[in-house]
Structures are given as C-alpha cells and as structure tokens.
Amino acid sequence: MSTAKDPGNGVYEILSLIFDFPSNEQRLWWHSTAPMFAAMLDNAGYSVHDQYRHLSIFKTHIIPFLGVYPTKGQERWLSILTRCGLPLELSLNCTDSVVRYAYEPINEMTGTEKDPSNTLPIIGSVQKLAQIQAGIDLEWFSYFKDELTLDESESAILQDTELVKEQIKTQNKLALDLKESQFALKVYFYPHLKSIATGNSTHFLIFDSVFKLSQKHDSIQPAFQALCDYVSRRNDSSEVDQHRALHARLLSCDLIDPAKSRVKIYLQEQTVSLPAMEDLWTLGGRRVDASTMDGLDMLRELWSLLKVPTGHLEYPKGYMELGEIPNEQLPSLVNYTLHRNDPMPEPQVYFTVFGMNDAEISNALTIFLQRHGFADMAKKYRVFLQDSYPYHDFESLNYLHSLVSFSYRRNKPYLSVYLHTFETGRWPVVADSPISFDAYRRCDLSTK
C-alpha cells in the first residue's frame, strides 16, 4: 500500500469539511476527482489562495454539469472526452506549470426527448462562467455553435429517422486554462452529428466554417490557406495510399475578444510513425525555419523516449466499458493554430499513449523534462501521479495517460499530458462508494 501523503496538501480535505452538496451524485464527483485536481494545483506551484479559488469554482460551477456519477451498468451520457465516456479530464502543461481541465456540460435533460443530442447545457455552463470571469466573449462561440452543432430541426430529423445509431454523440465541450487566480475559457466542437444530419462531411463542415470566418477576419487567411494547401496535397496523395489522408475531427477557439482569439483545427493522422509526425510538423516540408527545425529535433527525441508503437490505425466507433483495461492503440492527432498575419499555421502534435504502460511514460517524460531545464517538474511528476492513485499497482497501469502533446514556440518546448481523472486519491472516502477501475488495486478496501 502506498504511504504517500494525502493529495492536495490539505486544501481538498479542508474544503470537503466545509462544502455542502445538493445531491449524492455531486458529492461523489467531488471526492472522486478533487484529490487529483488539488494535488495537481499544488505541484504546479499555484498559491494556496488560488488553489482554494479554482477548487471552489470547480465544485460550484463545474460539478453540477457533470451529470450522474458513473457506475457499472448505470445508464448515463457517454462523452467523447475519454474512452470510457467520462465527461471530465485534467491536463497539465509540464513546461509552463499550467493546470487545465476539459468537460462536456451535461444536465438532467441530456439524452432525453427534450435534448437528445446534448445541445443545450453548454449554453448555461458558459453563461455561469462568464459571470465570474472577466473578458469572456461569446461571439465566436455563437458562430461556431450555429455552424457545427445541430439546430432543433436537424436534431428532430436524426431522431425521427433513427439515423444516429452510433454511441458517440458529443457535440461540444469546454476547457479552462488556469492562470494564477484567473482562467481562460475555450470551446471545442465535434460536428459528427451535424455531418449525419446535413450529409456534409465533418471535414467539410470544419473547413467551410473557418473559410467563412476568414472572409470577415482576413488576418487568418494566410495561415488558413497554407493549411488548406497542405491538407489538399496530403489527401490527393491518399488516392495512392489511403492512410495518408488527413481528416478534420474537431475545432476549438478561445472565448475572448475575436480580435485576440485563436482558431485551432484538429486533424486525425491514421499513420502512427515518426515520418508521419515529421510531415505534420513541417507541413510536408513547407515549414523549415530555424525554430521549426529546433522543435523537430525535440519531437524526434520525444518520439524516441516514448516508444509509441507504429501502425495504420482508426479511431474506435464505440466506448470502452467503465473499468475495462485498454487493449488498443489510437491514431495520432495534430492541431494547427491560425495566428493572425502569420503565413504558416502552428502545429501541436499529440502522441496517443493511451493503452501504453504509465510508469514507462512517466519515466520518459521525466527524462525529457530533465534534459530541457524543467528539473522541478521532472522531480515531481511521477510522484504526483502515483500519489493520485495510491492504492494501485502503478507499474502495471496503462490508462492514466491518454495523450502527450508537444509544440515549440518562443524557443522553448511546450509539453502537456492529458490524464485519467476518476476515483483519485484515497478513494473510496465514503462508505459503499463504487470502485470502477479495480483491476490493478493493491488491496481490498471493503473494510476501510
């Protein structure tokens, strides 16, 4: 059994004594996820005041939008955010020590006749966050929501014709980047259902929505055109090799003044290999400036350390069962940021490490961080992750890391990890709490 200290350095424990919860569902969500959240804030160097603020926001404004607490066999809304349909995921920028989390807003109407495709809760969630954080602007939120998610008539068409028989129905999610005491809000759109309803591909819907936006905000046109040219060349060559095709999967933007907001287009790469990563990074050889090549050297180093298996892969159509141990590998992912008045889009590549050994991934990341001047995070990272799941056999786990992302700008690497966030810390902390991921637990907690 782990002898690690309680995650959160006391902030989680103190708030747990203070908080009242309107339902047992929200109480379970708090005790399942807040220990890891608190520990991440502490390890990333947030002041104790900022830790209290962000955890309080999480309890008050986020947990009410997470829906029923997931247990095996219980009917619930499944979110594309994680492979087992959990609607919440913590992430950590290891090089900037910035904590983030993403969630798909859910409420009691989600999945019912009143809102079969979960279109509405995100509106209420955004409005609540806009009341407590200055600078949130909803212009681009409204634009992309109209362009990429179902309207009422389209939703009715899908239900009446039973066109939607697949499990994956997520249309949008929100993410908060926590910056000292404040947060920056981002939105992500998945137009898969819109594609089924309209007959237009997800790829077309995403690129068409950005094209129309660029007619009004022409400063993003150079980068957008460069991306279009690259994707067109790749997809034309897919007639010879089908695995070379790039498919747009989702889009995100910052919910701030449109004059400052960034648009990011996410593409799925079916070929998992170093040459494929290099092609994504350089836009097929079009980005060859000194900074790009410095970043490419680090990308190659990270690839070597992580030892991601190669192959031609497709994304699964359904979800894993809650508590199921993964035996799969996923395609790679890349996003391109369209900066204003920049002739080239900026890449961020994602290593899909879900299903790989978490101890080995932690060791690889530690080495990378040590080599590049992030000794403090290198020292803390593995300990933090082990302490977040103290009753598990850490050496055997293979589902804590879902993604490792990498970008390079202003002459430094940006490395982030996306982490399984469920039943963390000393779970269960309340009697008769469910235990879902128990395959690698070190002890029987039934008497504790």
Curated annotation (Swiss-Prot):
Keywords recorded for this protein, A-Z: Alkaloid metabolism, Transferase
The entry's substrate-binding residues are: R100, K186, Y188, R262, K264, Y266, Q348, Y350, Y414, Y418
Please list the residues that bind L-tryptophan: I80, L81, E89, Y190, R249
Does Transferase appear among the keywords? Answer: yes
GO terms for MF: tryptophan dimethylallyltransferase activity
Pathway it works in: Alkaloid biosynthesis; ergot alkaloid biosynthesis
GO terms for biological process, alphabetical: ergot alkaloid biosynthetic process
Cross-referenced InterPro entries: Aro_prenylTrfase (IPR033964), Aro_prenylTrfase_DMATS (IPR017795), DMATS-type_fun (IPR012148), Trp_dimethylallylTrfase (IPR017796)
Is Transferase there in the keyword field?
Answer: yes
Q: Name one matching Pfam family.
A: Trp_DMAT
Reaction catalysed by this enzyme: L-tryptophan + dimethylallyl diphosphate = 4-(3-methylbut-2-enyl)-L-tryptophan + diphosphate
EC numbers on record: 2.5.1.34
Say which family it is in: Belongs to the tryptophan dimethylallyltransferase family.
Biological role stated in the UniProt entry: Catalyzes the first step of ergot alkaloid biosynthesis. Ergot alkaloids, which are produced by endophyte fungi, can enhance plant host fitness, but also cause livestock toxicosis to host plants.
PANTHER family under this entry? INDOLE PRENYLTRANSFERASE TDIB-RELATED, PRENYLTRANSFERASE ASQH2-RELATED
Q: How does it assemble?
A: Homodimer.
Question: What is the protein named?
Answer: Tryptophan dimethylallyltransferase 2
Say which species the protein is native to: Claviceps purpurea (strain 20.1) (Ergot fungus)
Underlying gene: dmaW2
